[in-house]
């Protein structure tokens, strides 16, 4: 889901700023949006780690890893903002959450022999990248609301069809079944 949202946002953010006639200075923040998007993808990809750790007998590790995140993030943010400005803040966020989630990932892997990734994760990343590149190269020259809508429809369609065809997540089938029961079957 985070790849779906980020892909749609990143495909259309620049044109969205232009269509909404936002200040040109906001375009300088595009890479901040990209870096923060990557941080959210990492956090979402390892999102259940905190729930598993927090409800286990190792719940203290959840607290300590949060303290380590804070102790790592604050000085890193200060240093990077001081030297690189607003993009430094985004880089600090990405680095802090990457380290934080890696530590929790390793903890779960070692203590419980659990990890959230498999080959379908790789297929999801490849599918999203392919959908992004197709939309970017086919439709990037189309501006305005038309371009935004076309890119969003094509990107979303490629991902949704690919997710169902490749059976990348059982959640998608459950969501579809619930939708079908609620709206299509009477």
Task: State what each model feature region is.
Residues 1-3:
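Selective transmembrane-helix segments that form parts of the transport pathway or gating/packing helices
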Residues 6-7, 11, 31-57, 61-81, ...:
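Short runs within selected transmembrane alpha-helices of multi-pass transporters and secretion channels
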Residues 14-26, 139-147:
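Membrane-interface helix termini and inter-helical loops of multi-pass transporters
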Residues 18-19, 55, 82, 110, ...:
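Transmembrane helix-loop junction
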Residues 28-32, 116, 120-124, 128, ...:
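Residue-level signature of transmembrane alpha-helical entry/exit and packing/kink sites
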Residues 58, 109-118, 142-145:
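Membrane-interface helix-boundary motifs at transmembrane edges
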Residues 110-125, 173-184:
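Interhelical loop/hinge segments that connect adjacent transmembrane helices in multipass membrane
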Residues 137-186:
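Membrane-proximal transmembrane or re-entrant/amphipathic helices at the cytosolic face
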